[in-house]
A protein has these predicted regions:
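Conserved RNA-binding domains used in RNP assembly and mRNA/RNA metabolism
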Residues: 1-54
Length: 54
C-alpha cells in the first residue's frame, strides 16, 4: 500500500467513505488530506484503501 502514498485514494470504513490524498499509512493509523482538512483513521476501522478512479 505504500505505493498509494501521495495519490488520491478512497478509504472505506464500515461507517464512511473518505476521499483524499494519502499522506501516511502506519501500523495504527491512516493519515488522509481531504478538502475539509486532515483526517486520521484508526487502522482497525479501515476496510479498504484503493486509488481513486478518474
Amino acid at each position: 500500500m505504500d505505493n498509494l502514498i501521495g495519490k488520491l485514494v478512497v478509504v472505506e470504513t464500515q461507517e464512511t467513505t473518505y476521499t483524499g490524498k494519502l499522506s501516511e499509512i502506519g501500523e495504527d493509523d491512516v493519515h488522509l488530506e481531504t478538502e475539509m482538512g486532515w483526517i486520521v483513521i484508526p487502522m482497525e476501522r479501515v476496510a479498504l484503501i484503493r486509488e481513486k478512479e478518474d
